[in-house]
């Protein structure tokens, strides 16, 4: 609770210090500024690079990029992509899970809803995500997993992110 109050105070301070600049700002600039603040707070849920089971390479932002892992009996969770945002986003997510033993499950949290992707018989999966504003995360849960995972996340034909 104390951290939340400190963060709220910092947010109010930032808004107070920048409010004089908002008179000349366009609505898109204001949305971008507020989205950056939401993204900052949402980034605390993302697994740090040095703590990942696999390897992540970001593209445009924290929602897009490539993730790969080669595992030998790993257990844990990698929160790979996502964050907080006030903007809606449309992502294409595709990849492959090659399982030797154990399990690796791709989970997507979109605010309060959590879905698990079911790969086909060859381990491939792909889906389009219509992400609404809020907290949205793409993660993989490993349970004694031996095998490999490859995952790609990119924006679809969204002019805002081209």
Task: Identify the residue ranges that each predicted region occupies.
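Positively charged n-region of N-terminal signal peptides that target proteins for export
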Residues: 1-4, 11
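C-terminal motif of bacterial Sec signal peptides marking the signal peptidase cleavage site
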Residues: 15-19
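Transition segment at domain starts
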Residues: 24-83
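A glycine-anchored, Pro-Gly-centered beta-turn/N-cap motif
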Residues: 65, 132-136
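Extracellular and analogous surface-interaction loops
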Residues: 73, 80-91, 128-133
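A short beta-strand element within beta-rich, extracytoplasmic domains
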Residues: 89-99, 140
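Short, surface-exposed beta-strand/strand-loop-strand elements in extracellular ectodomains
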Residues: 100-117
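Edge beta-strands of jelly-roll/beta-sandwich modules across compartments, strongly enriched
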Residues: 142-160
């Amino acid at each position: 609770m104390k951290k939340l109050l400190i963060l709220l105070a910092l947010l109010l301070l930032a808004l107070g210090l920048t409010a004089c600049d908002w008179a000349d700002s366009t609505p898109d600039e204001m949305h971008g500024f507020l989205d950056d603040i939401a993204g900052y707070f949402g980034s605390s849920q993302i697994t740090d690079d040095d703590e990942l089971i696999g390897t992540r390479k970001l593209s445009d932002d924290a929602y897009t990029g490539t993730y790969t892992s080669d595992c030998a009996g790993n257990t844990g969770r990698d929160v790979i992509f996502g964050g907080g945002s006030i903007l809606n986003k449309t992502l294409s997510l595709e990849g492959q899970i090659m399982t030797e033993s154990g399990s690796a499950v791709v989970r997507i949290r979109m605010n309060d809803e959590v879905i698990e992707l079911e790969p086909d018989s060859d381990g491939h999966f792909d889906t389009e995500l219509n992400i609404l504003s809020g907290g949205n995360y793409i993660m993989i849960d490993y349970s004694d997993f031996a095998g490999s995972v490859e995952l790609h996340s990119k924006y679809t034909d969204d002019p805002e992110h081209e």
